[in-house]
A protein has these predicted regions:
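Interfacial/gating helices of multi-pass transporter permease domains
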Residues: 32, 38-64, 120-123, 217-221, ...
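Membrane-water interface segments that mark the loop-to-transmembrane alpha-helix transition
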Residues: 14-34, 55-56, 60-61, 65-110, ...
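Helix-loop interface residues and adjacent transmembrane-helix termini in multi-pass membrane transporters
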Residues: 44-47, 84, 115-118, 148, ...
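Membrane-interface junctions at transmembrane-helix termini in multi-pass inner-membrane proteins
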Residues: 77-83, 134-158, 175-176, 180
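Membrane-embedded alpha-helical segments of multi-pass transporters/permeases
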Residues: 35, 39, 43, 66-69, ...
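Residue-level recognition of pore/gate-forming positions within transmembrane alpha-helices
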Residues: 27, 31, 58-61, 98, ...
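Hydrophobic alpha-helical transmembrane segments
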Residues: 122-129, 157-202, 220-221, 228, ...
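Interhelical loop/hinge segments that connect adjacent transmembrane helices in multipass membrane
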Residues: 1-12, 16, 152, 195-236, ...
């Protein structure tokens, strides 16, 4: 019995180490891809395009981080993390959140365009917000795979979806020669992740369902995570949010 437990423990440790190696490796590759794409895109688009996309990214990242209630973390640590009702309730929360975030981008687009003196935001922000709507329907198989330390597969699919999104940005920017290439490319990347995770991650398909006990646990768990993500936004995006109100789009794009 002790030998069996020891073998199981060593197996979990080895799986965790492999997953960590995959995660670290994919991060390095993602940074290289991002650097390469930026070098190409700077030759295709004017600085104003990057300024507009910076403002779009600040808004989208802010909405995602300020609405984070820790559903993914709750699935990973909960005793009910493999229960179908629990997972479907989490999926329902994710889908509702993604839909509301997209509607919020539509509602905030015009006021933010006025605040930042960037009329382009009025119609580009709602389109970019479609990526939040799409991401809301990502399957809970992602969290389940992470829970069971299938990190290699998760990081590989995430890396592939990023590569597809970057390729779409570069290709569309070459054709459109405008910020629309960046906006649509981001949507393509979100759609690629949705399809890849639904097709290639193991587990039952999600459906809309509401379990009151599960919903309370999922939302209650994340009340402290909200505070940490809010602080994270201020540290990572606060400078862009502030400078965007004082710099021109060209200057912000260069920054």
């Amino acid at each position: 019995m002790q030998e069996t437990k020891g073998q199981k423990g060593r197996g979990l440790f080895a799986r965790a180490m492999r997953g960590s190696a995959f995660t670290a490796g994919s991060y390095v590759i993602a940074q290289v891809l991002r650097l390469g794409s930026n070098l190409i895109l700077t030759r295709l688009l004017a600085p104003e395009a990057f300024g507009v996309m910076t403002l779009v990214s600040v808004v989208l990242v802010g909405m995602v981080m300020f609405s984070d209630v820790g559903v993914s973390a709750s699935i990973s640590q909960s005793k009910r993390g493999d229960d179908a009702d629990f997972l479907n309730t989490a999926f329902t929360i994710h889908a509702f959140r993604g839909t509301m975030l997209w509607l919020a981008t539509c509602a905030l687009a015009w006021p933010l365009a006025q605040f930042y003196h960037a009329p382009e935001l009025a119609w580009r922000l709602p389109v970019a917000g479609i990526s939040l709507f799409i991401s809301g329907f990502n399957p809970t198989r992602i969290e389940t795979a992470t829970r069971h330390l299938l990190l290699g597969r998760v990081t590989l699919l995430d890396l592939i979806s990023q590569a597809i999104g970057i390729a779409a940005m570069v290709g569309l920017s070459m054709v459109l020669v405008s910020v629309w290439g960046l906006v649509i490319g981001a949507i393509v990347g979100s759609l690629a992740k949705l399809v890849l995770t639904w097709v290639y991650l193991p587990g039952p398909a999600n459906r809309f369902h509401w379990d009151r006990t599960a919903g309370h646990e999922l939302i209650h768990f994340g009340k402290w995570i909200f505070l940490s993500t809010a602080c994270g936004f201020l540290l990572s995006q606060g400078d862009k949010a502030i400078f965007g109100a004082y710099l021109s789009l060209e200057e912000l794009g260069i920054y």
